[in-house]
């Protein structure tokens, strides 16, 4: 079997109590893992989990939510912990907290503060192929333009439409954004969970399309209960973007449904090979292609 890379994968997880024992059984410790920052957890829990995962060998990318950080002292403490653990990449978001805990009301302010502390971190910023439920397209475009000069990559919100993803990448390229793009796709997860998240994340449009077209039989399957099969979406996106040198890879939203991750990894081995690897990504070795 060839070891040529066919897909570049980053797995998003939440810092749950059993993550350190469950994740290595599902995802190789040489892989890349993005760790969320939820309002009820706070950034400290994200950083602690990221440090612990890094000690196992993972390339960890902690999320830092601007609205959850109390100020410069806490930010510097968090960044120092990450530096000491060898963590060199971050993903910055505004976060879902309604009232900011400190001076950082949006991710642009946090981005500037991190860069003022150290320019050694690679920093990802968010992209929204289907827009944002609380922001206009003009606001999103302006935000991206402001943050891009200090950022290292764009990570897109979860989307169920290869067409919407490709269109978004083309649009930001035309707008002068030449950052590598990690394409956010759902992992194999229950439909009930996806539907409950759809409206909040602003992805209801492509979720409805995926369920309501002739693709339904290929996109949705019944195991013990109805679940989403992301294999076809990943193939379609890969076919569209594999030749783009700034296509960083797939950012897979696992929702900590880790038992299904090995099956997804097996499925990704059927993709046609790409030519380069992005920093902080996991390569999947080549098997005979099924497409």
Feature locations, PLM:
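Active-site glycine- and acidic-residue-rich loops that bind
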Residues: 69-72, 98-105, 156-169, 189-191, ...
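Conserved, mostly hydrophobic/aromatic
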Residues: 62, 82, 147-150, 183, ...
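Conserved beta-strand positions
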Residues: 35, 92, 125, 156, ...
């Amino acid at each position: 079997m060839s070891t040529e890379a066919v897909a570049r994968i980053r797995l998003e997880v939440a810092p749950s109590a059993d993550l350190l024992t469950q994740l290595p059984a599902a995802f190789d410790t040489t892989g890349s893992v993005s760790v969320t920052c939820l309002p009820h957890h706070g950034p400290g829990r994200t950083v602690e989990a990221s440090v612990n995962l890094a000690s196992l060998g993972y390339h960890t990318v902690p999320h830092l939510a601007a609205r959850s950080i109390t100020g410069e002292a806490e930010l510097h403490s968090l960044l120092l912990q990450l530096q000491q653990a060898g963590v060199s990449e971050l993903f910055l978001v505004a976060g879902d907290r309604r009232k900011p805990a400190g001076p950082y009301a949006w991710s642009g302010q946090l981005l500037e503060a991190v860069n003022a502390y150290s320019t050694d971190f690679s920093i990802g910023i968010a992209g929204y192929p289907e827009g944002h439920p609380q922001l206009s397209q003009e606001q999103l475009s302006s935000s991206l333009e402001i943050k891009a000069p200090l950022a290292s990559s764009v990570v897109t919100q979860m989307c169920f439409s290869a067409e919407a993803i490709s269109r978004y990448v083309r649009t930001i390229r035309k707008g002068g954004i030449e950052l590598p793009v990690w394409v956010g796709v759902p992992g194999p997860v229950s439909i009930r969970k996806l539907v409950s998240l759809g409206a909040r994340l602003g992805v209801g449009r492509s979720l409805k399309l995926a369920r309501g077209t002739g693709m339904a039989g290929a996109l949705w399957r019944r195991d013990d209960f109805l679940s989403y099969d992301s294999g076809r979406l990943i193939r379609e996106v890969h076919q569209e973007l594999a030749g783009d040198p700034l296509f960083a890879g797939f950012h897979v939203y696992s929702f900590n449904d880790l038992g299904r991750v090995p099956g997804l990894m097996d499925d990704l081995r059927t993709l046609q090979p790409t030519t380069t690897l992005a920093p902080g990504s996991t390569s999947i070795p080549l098997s005979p292609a099924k497409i």
